[in-house]
Design a protein with these regions (language model features):
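Transmembrane helix segments
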Residues: 20, 152-189
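Secretory targeting signals
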Residues: 3-56, 82-150, 170, 174-177, ...
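Junction motif at the cytosolic side of a transmembrane helix
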Residues: 219-241
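Residue-level recognition of pore/gate-forming positions within transmembrane alpha-helices
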Residues: 11-15, 89, 160-164, 225-226
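Membrane-helix interface/capping residues of multi-pass secondary transporters
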Residues: 2-4, 78, 152, 241
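Long, glycine/tryptophan/cysteine-rich extracytoplasmic
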Residues: 184-201
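Transmembrane helix boundary and interhelical loop/hinge segments in multi-pass membrane proteins
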Residues: 52-74, 78-79, 86
Length: 241
């Protein structure tokens, strides 16, 4: 319970706090090419770590304390218990992220709604909602990794590597001509880039190659998360606690 409050509180504080600060520091003309929800992205890039940590702790903390035995004794259907955890976590994470991003977006729209900001439509709000769902998927992936690893620190380390290492690894691979193709692929398909694209902050591409579509970024994470969740069901059903 305490970890839930701290992680969700950190998420809200980062997204809303950093976002409102960014809104104040921008001018109306800055939003001619940016969506009103763009300032929320600055805090969300760090706040997504709070979602990842909460996803891991939702399942791994019970393994660490031994409470998972009590849980499975009270509710012998392990798959139903795991499903309930996924649903509750996913709902809470999505609502918290969406409300935080929406608050910052509305704040920006109120302060910078003049003609200098240019036209804005529902598409940018839909993109922000997709970005919030993207972060929620990262949390669900973290929860699946926590169920597989059963160790909080190890699962968090794995997820931090998944989120932060691809841009670094891709840049290193781009140095050598032999691996530049792989490096460009890694730089185009990773969590930070996907989040930026969904929020409508476009990139110019890597090495002359066009960036993948928003749907491609979302589909990749959906497939990876689905595979990890499926593996977690198989492992939790067969493995002793």
């Amino acid at each position: 319970m305490r970890s839930t409050l701290w992680t969700l509180g950190s998420l809200v504080a980062l997204v809303v706090g950093v976002g409102m600060l960014a809104v104040v520091q921008t001018a109306s003309q800055d939003y001619e090419k940016l969506p009103y929800t763009a300032p929320a992205l600055f805090g969300l890039m760090v706040g997504q770590i709070a979602v990842i940590v909460l996803g891991v702790l939702t399942i791994s903390s019970e393994y660490g304390t031994g409470l998972i035995r009590t849980t499975f004794t009270a509710a012998p259907d392990r798959l139903r218990v795991l499903t309930a955890k996924y649903l509750v976590f996913g709902t809470v994470a999505l609502l918290t992220t969406t409300l935080s991003v929406g608050f910052v977006g509305l704040w920006a729209a109120i302060l910078h709604s003049g003609p200098a900001a240019g036209p804005h439509g529902l598409a940018e709000w839909a993109g922000a909602l997709a970005g919030c769902f993207y972060v929620t998927l990262l949390g669900l992936l973290a929860m699946a990794v926590g169920a597989l690893v059963r160790h909080s620190a190890g699962a968090i380390a794995v997820m931090l590597g998944v989120v932060t290492m691809p841009p670094v690894l891709g840049s290193i691979l781009m140095v050598w001509p032999v691996t530049s193709g792989v490096g460009g692929l890694v730089l185009r398909y990773n969590a930070p880039v996907g989040l930026f694209q969904l929020f409508g902050v476009q990139d110019n591409g890597v090495g002359g190659a066009a960036m993948p579509s928003d749907l491609a970024q979302m589909t990749l994470l959906v497939l990876v998360t689905a595979a990890a969740v499926t593996a977690s069901y198989a492992v939790v059903r067969r493995r002793d606690v």
